[in-house]
UniProtKB/Swiss-Prot annotation:
PANTHER family: DEOXYGUANOSINETRIPHOSPHATE TRIPHOSPHOHYDROLASE-LIKE PROTEIN, DEOXYNUCLEOSIDE TRIPHOSPHATE TRIPHOSPHOHYDROLASE. One of its GO terms (molecular function) is dGTPase activity. Residues 73-217 form the HD domain. The lineage of its organism: Bacteria, Pseudomonadati, Pseudomonadota, Alphaproteobacteria, Hyphomicrobiales. GO terms for biological process: dGTP catabolic process. This is Deoxyguanosinetriphosphate triphosphohydrolase-like protein. It comes from the Bacteria.
C-alpha cells in the first residue's frame, strides 16, 4: 500500500467517486449555489439543523449527564465525520459527501441511545415499529421545519441514499439483513423518491459506515477506561489491543495509565484506517469500477475491513459487549432509561395534551397508528436531559440515572 500524497494538496477525483456536478438533484428542485457544491450545501444544512444540536445531549454509551468528558452522539458524530473524510481523501472520493453522510447518520437516535430505541420500538410494535435509521430519514425529509419551500432539509439524492443504505442494500439479493423487514417510513419515502434500495450506496457512504465502526470501537474503550469499567490489564484479553499495548509499553515503559490508554486508542484508529484503505484499494483493483454506476452494481461493499481485521474487530466487540455495554452499572441505568421512555410514551399516547402545542395540535383527528407515530417522533427528538425533566413533571417518581 502506498500512502504517498494522501492528505496533501489536490489529487484528481477517482472516476468512480460521486461527482457533485452530476448529482441526481433534490426532491424539491432548487437553484444551484454559485459558491458551494450540492454536497457541501447538504453538509451545511445538516450542521445548522436543530437535530444536529440535539445530539449534544444524547447518550452514546454513558448517560449524558454522568460526566463532561464522555462521548455524546454529537462528539461521536464529529469523530466519525473526521475519519470518513480521511478515508474519502485517501481513496480520491468526494470528502464533502462522505462528511455529510457521517454527520447525519445518527440523527434518528432517541434519548438514552439504543435503550431508548428499544423502548420506543416495543411501544410501537403494533404501529410499524421504531428504527433509528428510518427516523433519521423522517427528520431530514419531514420533521425539520426550517425552510419556507419544503419540510425537512431537502438533501440531495446522494446524501439521502447514503443515509438509508450506508450499511448496505435493504432489499434484493445483497440485502444486509434480508430477514428484517424494511421500516415502513423508508418504503413510503422510497415510493416518492427512488433510493434504489437493492443496490449498494456510494463509496462515500461506505466510508461513513466503516468510519462509524472505527470510531466507536476505539472511543468506547477510551470512555470505558475513563469510567473505570475497563482496565488496561483487562484489554490484554483482546489480541489487537494487546499487540498495540505491548508496543506502547515497550516504547514508553514509565508512561502513566491515562496516557497509555490514549496511545492505545490513537494507534487502534490508525491501524484500522490503514487496513480499510489497503483493503479498499485491493477490492477496487479487483472490481475495476469505471464509474459511480459500477459501484452501485457491485455484489459487495468495496470499502471495509480486511478479513483479518474483521475477525479481530469481532473479538474486540465481544469484549466490549461483555465488559462495557452489559456492565452491571450500565445495565442498571438502561433499565431506568427504559422506564422513562415507556412511561412518557404511555402518558402522551393516552393524553396528547401533555405534549407541547406543536405536537398535540391536530391529534384528535389522528387514528391510533398516526397518533403513535406522532408521539414517537416527539419522544425520539428529546435529549436525555429533556426526557428526565418531562418525566419529573408528569410523574411523582423518576428513576435515578445518577
Amino acid at each position: 500500500m502506498s500512502l504517498e500524497g494522501i492528505g496533501f494538496g489536490y489529487r484528481e477525483r477517482a472516476p468512480y467517486a460521486s461527482n457533485p456536478a452530476f448529482s441526481r438533484g433534490r426532491l424539491v428542485p432548487e437553484p444551484e449555489s454559485p459558491t458551494r457544491t450540492p454536497f457541501q450545501r447538504d453538509r451545511d444544512r445538516i450542521i445548522h439543523s436543530t437535530a444536529f444540536r440535539r445530539l449534544k445531549h444524547k447518550t452514546q454509551v454513558f448517560i449524558a449527564h454522568e460526566g463532561d468528558h464522555y462521548r455524546t452522539r454529537l462528539t461521536h458524530t464529529i469523530e466519525v465525520a473526521q475519519i470518513a473524510r480521511a478515508l474519502a481523501r485517501a481513496l480520491r472520493l468526494d470528502e464533502d459527501l462522505a462528511e455529510a453522510v457521517a454527520l447525519v447518520h445518527d440523527f434518528g437516535h432517541t434519548p438514552f441511545g439504543h435503550t431508548g430505541e428499544d423502548a420506543l420500538n416495543e411501544r410501537m410494535e403494533n404501529f410499524g415499529g421504531f428504527d433509528h435509521n428510518a427516523q433519521s430519514l423522517r427528520i431530514v425529509t419531514k420533521l425539520e421545519h426550517r425552510y419556507a419551500d419544503f419540510d425537512g432539509l431537502n438533501l440531495s439524492w446522494e446524501t439521502l441514499e447514503g443515509l438509508v443504505k450506508h450499511n448496505g442494500p435493504l432489499l434484493g439479493p445483497y440485502a444486509a439483513h434480508p430477514d428484517i423487514p424494511v421500516p415502513q417510513p423508508i418504503l413510503d419515502f422510497n415510493a416518492r423518491y427512488d433510493l434504489e434500495l437493492s443496490r449498494f450506496a456510494s463509496l462515500e457512504a461506505q466510508c461513513a459506515a466503516i468510519a462509524d465502526d472505527i470510531a466507536y470501537n476505539a472511543h468506547d474503550i477510551d470512555d470505558g477506561l475513563r469510567a473505570g469499567l475497563l482496565t488496561l490489564e483487562s484489554l490484554d484479553e483482546v489480541p489487537l489491543a494487546k499487540r498495540l499495548l505491548d508496543i506502547v509499553r515497550t516504547r514508553y515503559p514509565n508512561l502513566d495509565p491515562v496516557r497509555t490508554g490514549h496511545e492505545l486508542v490513537r494507534r487502534q484508529i490508525t491501524i484500522m484506517v490503514e487496513d480499510v484503505i489497503e483493503e479498499a484499494q485491493r477490492r477496487l483493483a479487483s472490481a475495476r469500477p469505471g464509474t459511480m454506476e459500477d459501484v452501485h452494481n457491485q455484489p459487495r461493499a468495496l470499502v471495509g475491513f480486511s478479513d483479518a481485521m474483521r475477525a479481530e474487530e469481532k473479538v474486540l466487540k465481544r469484549f466490549l459487549f461483555k465488559n462495557l455495554y452489559f456492565h452491571e452499572s450500565v445495565v442498571v441505568r438502561r433499565h431506568a432509561a427504559d422506564r422513562i421512555v415507556q412511561d412518557l410514551f404511555d402518558a402522551c399516547f393516552t393524553d396528547p395534551s401533555l405534549m407541547p402545542d406543536e405536537w398535540r395540535l391536530g391529534c384528535e383527528a389522528l387514528d391510533k397508528a398516526a397518533l403513535a407515530r406522532r408521539v414517537a417522533d416527539y419522544l425520539a427528538g428529546m435529549t436525555d436531559n429533556y426526557a428526565v425533566r418531562e418525566h419529573r413533571r408528569l410523574f411523582d417518581r423518576t428513576p435515578d440515572l445518577a
